[in-house]
């Protein structure tokens, strides 16, 4: 695997989750461009830098020990990658503090390095939170590969931070630099809310939640076919998002015990808010995690899952396949994984490689609901 070279450090970096013979790199030209641009400014050692949305730690790990750096983002996998890459390169795994995106930073910051996220609502929320947290003369520098850099990103920086200057392209990457200027303090439009009729719920959705403005069509196809009569079963909602699957299931199964996990901190916060609103003080475990990687083996009777098919800008079924493997490990013999997926993804054949029985519970023209029994 090639080293990541920058003016601050040469690093051996890995992605998360790790895959054997992974052809994808844990960095790109936008990471290098951001660090080269920062180095050209010759920042003092006490320069306070906030790094946002660092995919696998390339930015923060490079700056560790060179500047005063804090990292923040919405991905638990990104946090794991930062810690592993710091340790992998001879630095303390905790040498760069990490703050989940749903927590408040403590400025003032002299420089903010931003990897532009796929969800612009997350960028908007982060820019609003930066107001009042920037030192005089501070800059917010956002980087992305040009094919993933929407015009709206610069518009948001202009709106909330100050005048924006776009760089020349370099290795198909571009930077947007906003210099702090007088801007009215903004109120965040997040979280957003929407209502369901069946079950009757109002759901809170923080900025980076998938399908934040309404129920996604896969979940809509899944909800009428959630398992019933579960008794005191131990149930996990794997990749829970705003928690709607687990909450709907819990309302129909009052004695079952639930665990909700997601790698997005904002999804976890949304799920906590929604569980509290719908089910009050009913016991539940909700936390950010690498799926069910930390779940005790053979400790669940049921797993519910609407698996993702992309990680940031990378599309594929590798995350779904890993979640299916995790579910199999966590289920008792005779336990069942229930999933919804696009027909064209061929999940039936993939599940058949892991489980002794796979059946179609329901289907629409676009989606299938499957039950896989261990």
Curated annotation (Swiss-Prot):
Its main location: cytoplasm. It is an enzyme of class 2 (transferase). GO terms for molecular function: 23S rRNA (guanine(1835)-N(2))-methyltransferase activity; nucleic acid binding. Keywords: Cytoplasm, Methyltransferase, rRNA processing, S-adenosyl-L-methionine, Transferase. It comes from the Bacteria. Gene3D superfamilies: Vaccinia Virus protein VP39. InterPro entries: DNA_methylase_N6_adenine_CS, rRNA_m2G-MeTrfase_RlmG, RsmC/RlmG, SAM-dependent_MTases_sf, Small_mtfrase_dom. Specifically methylates the guanine in position 1835 (m2G1835) of 23S rRNA. PANTHER family: RIBOSOMAL RNA LARGE SUBUNIT METHYLTRANSFERASE G, RIBOSOMAL RNA SMALL SUBUNIT METHYLTRANSFERASE C. Belongs to the methyltransferase superfamily. RlmG family. This is Ribosomal RNA large subunit methyltransferase G. It comes from Pseudomonas entomophila (strain L48). The lineage of its organism: Bacteria, Pseudomonadati, Pseudomonadota, Gammaproteobacteria, Pseudomonadales. The gene is rlmG.
């Amino acid at each position: 695997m090639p080293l990541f070279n920058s003016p601050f450090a040469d690093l051996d970096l890995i992605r998360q989750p790790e895959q054997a013979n992974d052809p994808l790199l844990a960095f790109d030209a936008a990471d290098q461009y951001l660090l080269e641009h920062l180095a050209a400014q010759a920042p003092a050692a006490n320069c306070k830098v906030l790094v946002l949305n660092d995919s696998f730690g390339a930015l923060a790990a490079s700056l560790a020990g060179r500047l005063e750096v804090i990292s923040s983002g919405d991905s638990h996998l990104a946090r794991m990658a930062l810690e592993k890459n710091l340790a992998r390169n001879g630095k303390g795994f905790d040498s760069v503090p990490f703050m989940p995106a749903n927590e408040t930073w403590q400025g003032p910051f002299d420089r903010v390095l931003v990897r532009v996220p796929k969800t612009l609502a997350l960028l908007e929320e982060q820019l609003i939170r930066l107001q009042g947290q920037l030192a005089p003369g501070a800059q917010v520098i956002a980087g992305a590969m040009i094919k993933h850099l929407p015009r709206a990103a610069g518009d948001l920086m202009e709106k909330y931070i100050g005048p924006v200057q776009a760089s020349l392209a370099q290795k198909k990457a571009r930077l947007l630099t906003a210099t702090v200027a007088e801007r009215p303090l903004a109120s965040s439009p997040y979280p957003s809310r929407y209502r369901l009729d069946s079950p009757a719920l109002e759901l809170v959705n923080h900025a980076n939640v998938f399908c934040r403005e309404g129920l996604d069509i896969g979940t809509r196809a899944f909800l009428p076919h959630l398992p019933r009569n579960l008794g005191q079963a131990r149930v996990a909602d794997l990749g829970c998002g705003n928690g709607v699957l687990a909450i709907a299931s819990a309302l129909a199964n009052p004695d079952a015990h639930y665990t909700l996990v997601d790698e997005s901190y904002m999804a976890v916060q949304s799920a906590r808010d929604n569980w509290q609103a719908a089910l009050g003080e009913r016991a539940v475990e909700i936390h950010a995690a690498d799926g069910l990687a930390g779940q005790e083996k053979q400790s669940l009777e049921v797993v519910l899952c609407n698996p993702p098919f992309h990680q940031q800008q990378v599309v594929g079924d590798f995350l779904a396949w890993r979640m299916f493997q995790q579910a199999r490990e966590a289920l008792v013999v005779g336990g069942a994984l229930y999933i919804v997926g696009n027909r064209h993804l061929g999940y039936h054949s993939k599940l058949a490689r892991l489980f002794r029985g796979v059946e179609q519970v329901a289907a629409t023209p676009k989606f299938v609901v499957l039950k896989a029994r261990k």
